[in-house]
């Protein structure tokens, strides 16, 4: 929906805010006795409607999704069933997303100086073919959009590798509940104080599953998972009961293969029941928790309240309107311009990132989030989670203004297709965009005396942030793409949410974590994040070089000691020529800078006009290569890996990663195993960040964020003749009228610091809005 044209600027402003009313944006309110906060409505150019003719990087529109559905449902050979009728042994659409044209075609279209036809749009559609023998996952490319007439098979994947989905979860939950309740109802009630069926307010539930891939079970084609039992109170992850079942799925046959209870393994539910009838059988009593605001696992305000009175916290304002625009998933901000979209499986991706209209990054995209737990009992021992298999992008929804993003941010919905809905599902508030003052400065210096001074010059650190938050079961991950005024691009990840503890026993005390209360151990786990950075510095023919900082042994001319030497550091240029040479594992004894450049372009000083990659979130994986599930995440072996870009190597992971550990659908090791030349080639940097988390009592009920943020940066390195932010109107310069006579006063040069403007910060009506529409934030049907 476009903004209506009006004669009055303030009317236009109100319409702009009305378009975003539930997002927390509102016009600024005049404070009594203060100057009115006049806003230049021209700046407020956000258009969050869907285009009739989508730009090349735009997500599939609802019209395109519906037309692809209609086309596929008419293909009788696919035997597709509609949502609601689909079962795991039928054929149904699992999801779809944009399928980008080849990069060469896209670059040609973007850079053409004459009118050029846009490459045709297409969708990649994932279909679960449970109706086939053998069952299989099929991916099809459907084109051209918006009115498809053709489709072709993209790839086939073994059915046991399929990602988790609602249809399967419902089937498994029903199977486990009936099987376990039918055999062990009395056992569960006496041991854990609750039931699986007809449980009232004392419910037990199989909330979490630890996948066991073929490389772990050494049973090709088998899809296994340990399902953990929890007491179903807020939050269930903090109420484990030391009971789990190993479920095996082959085709459409479900069996319970093992049962774990109280540090003992059993071959069946019946075996547990038989032993339980024996009076000598070790009992375990875990009382069902009393639900109250004081329950340790509950996120309810409690303890000593602060501040002393309910005084509102600080809020930022935009006194003259927004300084960025969003239209058709393209953001323009100062000298930056970029497109963004959402992959339902792998999460947020940015494209065509430009600074001063010069392409810096063709694609910046999350690839996977991995969490590897450790523990004494099987649910934690095998808890190696590849979150792509849980559909990272589908779990973006419900960011709250004033907490998750500033109140005045622009909130943006995404539309996806899920297997459980015939219509495109709207992920409300999937993204937010906002400009903020970080409270730091971009640069500053003060010189108080002659001969240089007296003067002061400084620029506040103002940035634009594109944010997405994905919630995968118990954990929440904030993913920020941060655009600095000086051409620096920052990518930041912050984990928070609930930990997955285990029941305290003597066997796991202190070995895998600390005791958090009278019944829990906070299990050690390792978070890892992988990003793709398709760097294009002055074109697609780039080099990757490390500037190695090495010891320089030189003469010591001022020393009176004969043959004395002086040690300092020097730079050694190290051009990485092949992919194997471009695998980086951090070594504290070998400091270096990582730079990317086009060798055919030099600065006036003769330097390579480069961008530097800085990884400030490095974490080493200790797992032996190819052990357990490690092979699926081969990217975690290196903090940076640089490879030659290929259309067949578009992602380092896939939604099939959880069970594909024996023969991964995407094997990242193959990206560099052929050891191709990377000199003057189109290069991709694969950046891995991570952190080890040893939970402590302050992680109850929820892990806090300070100290957990991880970032990597792309920073200009001899790319500009000087700081490109020297032109910032946000700068302040203070100097003496006469530097030899301060008594003559000072002069102040500032352009964006209004002196008499006193405004209330935007409050918005978001909370009133969700009272009437709770599905905005929660999955309520």
Swiss-Prot record:
It is found in: Secreted. The keyword Iron does not apply. Keywords: Calcium, Copper, Disulfide bond, Manganese, Metal-binding, Oxidoreductase, Secreted, Signal, TPQ. One of its GO terms (molecular function) is primary methylamine oxidase activity. It is an enzyme of class 1 (oxidoreductase). Its EC number is 1.4.3.-. Its cofactor is Cu cation; Ca(2+); L-topaquinone; Mn(2+). GO terms for biological process: amine metabolic process. The keyword Lyase does not apply. Ca(2+) 1 binds at residues 534, 536, 682-683. Prismatic layer of shell (at protein level). Expressed primarily in the mantle with highest level in the mantle edge and lower level in the mantle pallium. Gene3D superfamilies: 3.10.450.40, Copper amine oxidase, catalytic domain. Ca(2+) 2 binds at residues 579, 671, 674, 676. Substrate binds at residues 385-395, 472-477. Cu cation binds at residues 525, 527, 693. InterPro entries: Cu_Am_Ox_Cu-bd (IPR049947), Cu_Am_ox_TPQ-bd (IPR049948), Cu_amine_oxidase (IPR000269), Cu_amine_oxidase_C (IPR015798), Cu_amine_oxidase_C_sf (IPR036460), Cu_amine_oxidase_N-reg (IPR016182), Cu_amine_oxidase_N2 (IPR015800). This is Putative amine oxidase [copper-containing].
